[in-house]
Amino acid sequence: VGGGSNSGGAVLRGFFNDAQMSAMTPRLNPALPTGLDYYPLLAPGERFPLNDPSYAPRLTPRPSDDVTFFQGLLEGIARIEQRGYQLLAELGAPSPTSVRSVGGGAQNSAWTKLRARLLKVPMLTPEHQDAAYGAALLALRGTQ
């Protein structure tokens, strides 16, 4: 399942570059919630899981420790994903029993553990991690 949220990697890169995120990742504690209630957006406006062009980012309070702030952003993104699955379940879709993900974030073990904690399902690593591979499989199945 993919969602078109305006939150995600672009928000993280609005605050940190890849080297900074890589350096902070070993200091994250995915088992211990920060208590921060962020809705990470770079600017007002959200598409999924709610459609509100004026929905405001929620990025305060900003702790002085960048690692805690980084983890709070990741938790906020994971809660958006969690809400998407909740809405799908309310519409009759089955709740996921596991989640597979690809892309840069999928390579971050702390992020994967944090998502598993919030989503309450195992995060699995697909054999092929290129998103185009999955699209090609779907296209192949559609022609058969």
Regions found by a protein language model. Name each.
Residues 1-99, 107-131, 136-144:
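Active-site core segments that coordinate phosphate-bearing ligands/cofactors
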